[in-house]
């Protein structure tokens, strides 16, 4: 809507290639003409897309945490009454404690939702022991972070590995890697599942199917 399909396609390809230097250069060039005007149009488009997503989910109870490109401010300003922002929170579901720690793994892109490993570690510490840990990005396991389309390793949380091995939650749920080499892995005694709804097969995870 703002930059056109050709420019966006180039950005996507550079991201797939992990060519962060050229991607950053291209991104900067897109704001040269009138930075303030372009930024305003971009923000309007971002708000509109959040609103469209929340409108589509209006009949469901939604728990949300930020990902690598998400803004807490925009989420909270656009989310509907059925949405609960649960980052850094623990909720009780039936007999289980479910913890949520959002944010994206830091990259050279420096997207608005990325946080430092130190900040992410503090989120995990705040949660303590839970039965299910929910994050945006996966633990740092090669098979879980490798994208089979680009044949490149994406991002994973090393502090999440430590948390899983120390606290031993029953499940680790995450997304972020869109075409993972493995969508399931066992780390210690914890079952790690990529639950992203992206595989073009209309499948999604029903929590009740795992816990009865």
Predicted features, each with a name:
Residues 2-6, 65-75, 91, 106-109, ...:
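Active-site environment of divalent metal-dependent phosphoester hydrolases
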Residues 1, 130, 157-177:
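Proline-aspartate-enriched helix->loop->beta-strand connector
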Residues 74-82, 150-161, 185-199:
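Short, electropositive alpha-helical surface patch
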Residues 62-67, 98, 172, 192:
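Hydrophobic/aromatic residues located in beta-strands of well-ordered beta-sheets
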Residues 130-149:
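Active-site rim beta-loop-alpha module in soluble metabolic enzymes
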Residues 1-93, 165-166, 195:
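Core catalytic region of metal-dependent phosphoesterases/phosphodiesterases
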């Amino acid at each position: 809507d703002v930059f056109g399909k050709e420019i966006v396609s180039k950005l996507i390809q550079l991201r797939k290639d992990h060519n962060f230097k050229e991607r950053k250069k291209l991104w900067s060039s897109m704001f040269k003409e009138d930075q303030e005007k372009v930024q305003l149009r971009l923000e309007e488009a971002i708000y509109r897309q959040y609103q469209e997503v929340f409108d589509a989910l209006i009949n469901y109870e939604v728990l949300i945490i930020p990902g690598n490109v998400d803004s807490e401010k925009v989420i909270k300003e656009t989310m509907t009454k059925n949405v609960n922002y649960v980052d850094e929170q623990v909720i009780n579901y039936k007999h289980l404690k479910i913890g949520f720690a959002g944010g994206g793994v830091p990259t050279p892109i420096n997207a608005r939702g990325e946080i430092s490993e130190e900040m992410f570690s503090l989120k995990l510490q705040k949660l303590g022991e839970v039965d299910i840990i929910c994050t945006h990005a996966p633990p740092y396991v090669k098979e879980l972070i490798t994208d089979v389309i680009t044949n490149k390793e994406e991002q994973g949380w090393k502090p999440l590995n430590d948390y899983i091995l120390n606290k031993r939650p029953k499940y680790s749920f995450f997304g972020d890697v869109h075409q993972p080499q493995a969508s399931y892995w066992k780390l210690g005694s914890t079952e790690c599942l990529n639950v992203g709804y992206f595989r073009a097969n209309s499948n999604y995870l029903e929590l009740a199917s795992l816990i009865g």
